[in-house]
Amino acid sequence: MSSVKEITSDSSKYRGLLEESTSIVTIPPRGGGIIKPGIIILPKAPCFLFIGDLHGDLSSAHSVLKSMWSELTGECIIVFLGDYVDRGSYQLETLTLVLLLKKNYHDKIVLLRGNHEPPTWLTPYPHDYPYYLSTRFSSTWRDLYQTSLNLFNTLPLVAILEDFFIALHGGPPLTVLTSSSWQDAFEAGREGFSSRVLEEILWSDPVEEDLEYLESPRGAGVLFGKKVTNKALKLIRGRYIIRGHEAVNGVKTNHNGLVFTVFTASIVYNLNCAGVLKLVYKENNYIPQALCIKPSSEL
C-alpha cells in the first residue's frame, strides 16, 4: 500500500486516490445504510469516536489515531466531522490520511463533509487548499482541484443513529422546525440537498438562547437556539447533536448538554487539546466522554 508521503509526492497517485474515494466515502459502516442525497444511517455499535476539524493538522491527526488505534481496530465506529483541508501546512497529507483510513477500514470509518470541503458557490475563507496544490503540483493542480471538488460533492453531510444522535459539521437545518419527520427535514430521497439545507448543515453554530435562530456573523448558516436542537432531537427521538466547526479547546457543550462541539486541530490553533468525543453504549444508552489528546509536533 502506498504511504501518505508517496501519494502526496506523485500527482497521478494523488489523483487516483481522490477518484477512487468518490465511490468509497459513501460506503456506510457494516449494518448501516446510506440514503440520498448524503445521509449515513448508522448501526448500533459498542462505541463511537467523533473527531472534529483537522484543517491540515497532520500532527494532531497522528496523535489522536495513535491514542485511539485499539478502538479503530476493535469495535468502535469513528466519525470524522469534516474540515480536512485549509489553514494547516499538511493539507494534502491530512486529506490523504483520512481517505486511506476510509479505504482500508471502510466499515468502521465515516467521513462527513465540512464547510471547507465547499460547493463552488459557497467558498470559505481562508480556502488555501488550491494554493497548497499549486505549490506541490504546479502543472496539474487545477485538474487536481477539480477532482477534489468532485470528491467533496460526494461526501455525506449527516450521520444519524435513530433514538440516539445526529452527527454533522455545523448544525441541523431550520427545516426541522416545520417538518414532521427527520426524513423530510434532511430532504431524504432527493437527488441533492437544497442550497439552504446544505448551507445550514455546513455553517450553522449553536447559541445559548431559548429561541429558534439568529443571523450568523459568519455570513452563512445561522446561530441556532435550543428550540432547533430540541425539535431536531425530537424527530429522531435522540439525545445528542455532535458537531465540529468551532475552534474550541477540545470539546464543549451547549443547550444543557444536548449539543457537543468537537475540535481536533490543536496545533494549527495553538490549543493544548486535540478533542475527541467518545460515546460508549451502556444500559440502553450512549454515555458521552470528552477526551483531550495531547498533541505531538512530531510527524
What are these regions (language model features)?
Residues M1-L299:
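Feature recognizes metal-dependent phosphohydrolase scaffolds
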